């Protein structure tokens, strides 16, 4: 716990509060290594109210998550403990309006919980941008169900990935076609893309 205290030193939390939250996270099933990473990503979680976090966990279980899934999601996005259930529920409803089923939103958020931290207008802009590239709305929905992390990439990152692939002699039409079936290409380094494409063509 000493390393966590060092990370939190600038926040002025007293040792008793840190220990209470530390013990709470340990009891939930987090390891010390996981808590250190969480403290680095969002140190304020060690100042959150324990009763509020417990309530959040119980409400998320009602939405369809297991405790193990919540632990995994909050390792990626520890600030989820600071989001209200109302905001999470609203995000699920907003994404249903985009074309997902409730079950699909739950499923993709398990892989990319960061979507709960993105404004719905940000998601809409990402969809509109991808439509401008040549994808159909239903293709984008399918791609993001298969590879939800696309939503966490900035538009500039996607633009750069397309430019990098064009340097490999692929046209934009080629790239659109390839990524429809394999959207995880957007998550590869340019060094790995060529090998992946060659493997797909064999």
Can you describe what each PLM-predicted range is?
Residues 1-202:
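Long amphipathic alpha-helical repeat/alpha-solenoid cores
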């Amino acid at each position: 716990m000493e390393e966590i205290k060092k990370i939190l030193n600038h926040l002025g939390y007293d040792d008793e509060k840190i220990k209470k939250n530390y013990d709470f996270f340990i009891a939930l099933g987090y390891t010390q290594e996981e808590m250190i990473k969480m403290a680095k990503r969002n140190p304020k979680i060690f100042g959150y109210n324990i009763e509020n976090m417990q309530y959040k966990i119980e409400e998320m279980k009602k939405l369809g998550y297991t405790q193990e899934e919540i632990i995994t999601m909050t390792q990626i996005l520890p600030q989820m403990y600071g989001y209200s259930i109302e905001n999470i529920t609203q995000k699920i409803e907003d994404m249903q309006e985009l074309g997902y089923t409730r079950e699909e939103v739950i499923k993709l958020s398990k892989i990319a919980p960061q979507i709960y931290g993105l404004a719905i207008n940000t998601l809409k802009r990402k969809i509109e941008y991808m439509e401008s590239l040549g994808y159909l709305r239903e293709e984008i929905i399918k791609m993001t169900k298969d590879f939800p992390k696309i939503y966490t990439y900035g538009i500039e990152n996607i633009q750069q990935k397309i430019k990098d692939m064009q340097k490999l002699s692929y046209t934009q039409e080629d790239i659109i076609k390839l990524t429809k079936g394999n959207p995880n290409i957007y998550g590869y380094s340019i060094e790995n893309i060529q090998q992946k494409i060659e493997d797909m063509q064999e």
